[in-house]
Amino acid sequence: MKLVLASGNQGKLNELKALLSKQPVEIYSMSDFNNIKEAQETGKTFAENAIIKAQNVADSTGYLSLADDSGLEVDALDGAPGVYSARYAGENACDQDNNNKLLRSLKDIPYKQRTARFKCVIAIAYPDTPPVTFTGTCEGYILREPKGDRGFGYDPLFYHPDMGKTFGELYQEEKSSISHRGKALEKLVANFQDVMSLMEG
């Protein structure tokens, strides 16, 4: 069976191929197809956006498709930046712009109330079949200043208590073992045969 990743990101493609290497599936990137239009991420939740992206590719190609959507939820900000994580400081904002806005928004919030989580939702879609989702979360706190220069996005501000470091201080292997995306992918791998049966049925 063919599975199309609803992304042109080579890193995500390699990761997915490695995780599903023992499964009877050929994995492609949406870059391998010419007829796929960019999906409009109009969802109010990570799950809605992941489903929109996966369904768009499934309907365009006729194949099983996988997409993910993820971001940061800060409790003191009622779950913001949420689905706007990548553009929190504006449409063309860079990581530093978003981080600076987050720090300004939490300026007067004490550490104990700076709880936050990274959330990732993976959606699998197939034409004329209800989509299936898997969710992974990683809990932590937002620091008052960035630490570490690894990772991307909010990683230097996101402190993981069990690791005693920010995501910006962790090596990729360490981060993958505890990250929201890693947890969602684990659930996908554990349930992949069931999902295949459901979609093929």
Swiss-Prot record:
Documented EC number(s): 3.6.1.66
GO cellular component: cytosol
Enzyme class (EC, first level): hydrolase
Binding site for Mg(2+): D69
Keyword Disulfide bond listed: no
GO BP terms, alphabetized: nucleotide metabolic process; purine nucleoside triphosphate catabolic process
Active site (UniProt): D69
Binding site for substrate: S7, G8, N9, Q10, G11, K12, S70, F152, G153, Y154, D155, K175, H180, R181
Catalytic activity: XTP + H2O = XMP + diphosphate + H(+); dITP + H2O = dIMP + diphosphate + H(+); ITP + H2O = IMP + diphosphate + H(+)
Record note on cofactor: Binds 1 Mg(2+) ion per subunit.
Transmembrane spans: none
Keyword terms, alphabetized: Hydrolase, Magnesium, Metal-binding, Nucleotide metabolism, Nucleotide-binding
A Pfam family hit: Ham1p_like
Annotated GO MF terms: dITP diphosphatase activity; ITP diphosphatase activity; metal ion binding; nucleotide binding; ribonucleoside triphosphate phosphatase activity; XTP diphosphatase activity
PANTHER family hit by this protein: INOSINE TRIPHOSPHATE PYROPHOSPHATASE, INOSINE TRIPHOSPHATE PYROPHOSPHATASE/HAM1 PROTEIN
Primary role: Pyrophosphatase that catalyzes the hydrolysis of nucleoside triphosphates to their monophosphate derivatives, with a high preference for the non-canonical purine nucleotides XTP (xanthosine triphosphate), dITP (deoxyinosine triphosphate) and ITP. Seems to function as a house-cleaning enzyme that removes non-canonical purine nucleotides from the nucleotide pool, thus preventing their incorporation into DNA/RNA and avoiding chromosomal lesions.
Family stated for the protein in its record: Belongs to the HAM1 NTPase family.
Subunit (UniProt): Homodimer.
Identification of the protein by name: dITP/XTP pyrophosphatase
Organism ancestry: Bacteria, Bacillati, Bacillota, Clostridia, Natranaerobiales
